[in-house]
Amino acid sequence: MDERDRLQQEIATIFVERFDTRLASDDVDLIETGLVDSVKIVELVLELEQRFGVSLPFEDLEIEDFRTVPRLAERIARTAPAIG
């Protein structure tokens, strides 16, 4: 398992632990399906920052970063290259 896969697995785990939601696949559109809304984005950012030790300032984030698990993993990897 490479680092991107590990990141994606951790993000999926956050959805289970934090939101009691098991994702059907990594490519499910989190926004279109309503799995992520503005409140959950805030909660998710805080959890990601804590879990991965990164800083994700809201002014640097795009809504597209939250579309899918792979996009979230990519955003975290860009923020902290040593992780991804």
Task: State where each predicted segment sits.
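Phosphopantetheinylated carrier protein domains
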Residues: 42-65, 84
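Short alpha-helical elements of helix-turn-helix
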Residues: 9, 39-42
